[in-house]
């Protein structure tokens, strides 16, 4: 049997995509709308406290197109903590008007294709560079791009039949492309084998949305992607600071 990849695992992630039920929202009187938005604001203030003490992260983006209107991206140190956030959000009155359209569960990971190279001989969980990757601070970038992906198991193009050494080299070559976008695109990789329908969830942040097109295009021509990758739907959006939520919901 081929050697299986080992991973270092950090925060658990939930991408929660919602569509606003505008027809139902319009039927509410302004007073009820304000009460619901205030309740949401208190919820987000509590989320900010968790962020400030280093026990998690979160951000909100407005999604373009008809796949969703919003994505709530939350990171926590356990599935229980993540589920608690999800359940509390669903109990908000405004959640009745935010219809689920898609979700993705993963855990921030760094594989031993790369982790040993980054950490050298030390305990990788004590390495500052590794920890920054596993427990990332979400950047307040203007745009987000999320997509799930898997590695192929198709005849001769079967990633899982390749020797470890070949997989390591392909991933390192693939990573060189990502590193060439340092300062332009920040990437968070969530492993989701056994958690969701694909094997990874990829989240990209940038102040220039065209950088998403450039990096994904360039990576498509790399062998690790061209031969061995399969992709799900892509979601793209704009940063939505919590203080601008009321403006979004104003009719």
From Swiss-Prot:
Segments forming a coiled coil: none
InterPro entries (UniProt xref): CHDC, ChdC/CLD, Dimeric_a/b-barrel
Keyword terms of this UniProt record: Heme, Heme biosynthesis, Iron, Metal-binding, Oxidoreductase
Gene Ontology BP, a term: heme B biosynthetic process
Enzyme class: oxidoreductase
Annotated pathway: Porphyrin-containing compound metabolism; protoheme biosynthesis
Molecular function terms, GO-annotated: heme binding; metal ion binding; oxidoreductase activity, acting on the CH-CH group of donors, oxygen as acceptor; peroxidase activity
Named cofactor requirement(s): Fe-coproporphyrin III
Residue positions of the active site: 147
Catalytic activity: Fe-coproporphyrin III + 2 H2O2 + 2 H(+) = heme b + 2 CO2 + 4 H2O; Fe-coproporphyrin III + H2O2 + H(+) = harderoheme III + CO2 + 2 H2O; harderoheme III + H2O2 + H(+) = heme b + CO2 + 2 H2O
E.C. no: 1.3.98.5
Cofactor note: Fe-coproporphyrin III acts both as a substrate and a redox cofactor.
Superkingdom per UniProt: Bacteria
Residues that hold Fe-coproporphyrin III according to the record: 133, 147-151, 174, 187, 225
Protein task: Involved in coproporphyrin-dependent heme b biosynthesis. Catalyzes the decarboxylation of Fe-coproporphyrin III (coproheme) to heme b (protoheme IX), the last step of the pathway. The reaction occurs in a stepwise manner with a three-propionate intermediate.
Similarity section: Belongs to the ChdC family. Type 1 subfamily.
PANTHER family given in the database record: COPROHEME DECARBOXYLASE, HEME-DEPENDENT PEROXIDASE YWFI-RELATED
NCBIfam families noted in UniProt: PRK12276.1
Record's protein name: Coproheme decarboxylase
Biological source species: Listeria monocytogenes serotype 4b (strain CLIP80459)
Gene encoding the protein: chdC
């Amino acid at each position: 049997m081929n050697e299986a990849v080992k991973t270092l695992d950090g925060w658990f992630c939930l991408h929660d995509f919602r569509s606003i039920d505008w027809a139902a929202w319009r039927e509410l009187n302004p007073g009820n709308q304000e009460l619901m938005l205030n309740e949401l604001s208190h919820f987000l203030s509590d989320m900010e406290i968790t962020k400030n003490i280093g026990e998690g992260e979160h951000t909100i983006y407005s999604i373009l197109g008809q796949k969703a209107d919003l994505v709530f991206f939350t990171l926590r140190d356990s599935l229980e903590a993540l589920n608690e956030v999800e359940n509390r959000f669903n109990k908000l009155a405004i959640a009745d008007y935010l219809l689920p359209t898609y979700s993705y569960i993963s855990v921030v990971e760094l594989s031993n294709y790369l982790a040993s190279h980054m950490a050298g001989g030390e305990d990788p969980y004590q390495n500052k560079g590794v920890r920054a990757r596993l427990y990332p601070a979400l950047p307040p970038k203007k745009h987000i791009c999320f997509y799930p992906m898997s590695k192929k198991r198709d005849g001769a193009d079967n990633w899982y039949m390749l020797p470890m050494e070949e997989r390591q080299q392909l991933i390192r070559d693939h990573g060189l492309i990502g590193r060439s976008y340092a300062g332009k695109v920040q990437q968070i990789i969530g492993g989701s084998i056994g958690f969701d329908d694909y094997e990874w969830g990829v989240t990209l942040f940038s102040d220039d949305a065209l950088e998403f097109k450039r990096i994904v295009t360039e990576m498509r021509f790399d062998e690790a992607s061209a031969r061995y990758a399969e992709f799900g739907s892509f979601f793209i959006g704009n940063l939505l600071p919590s203080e601008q939520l009321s403006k979004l919901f104003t009719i």
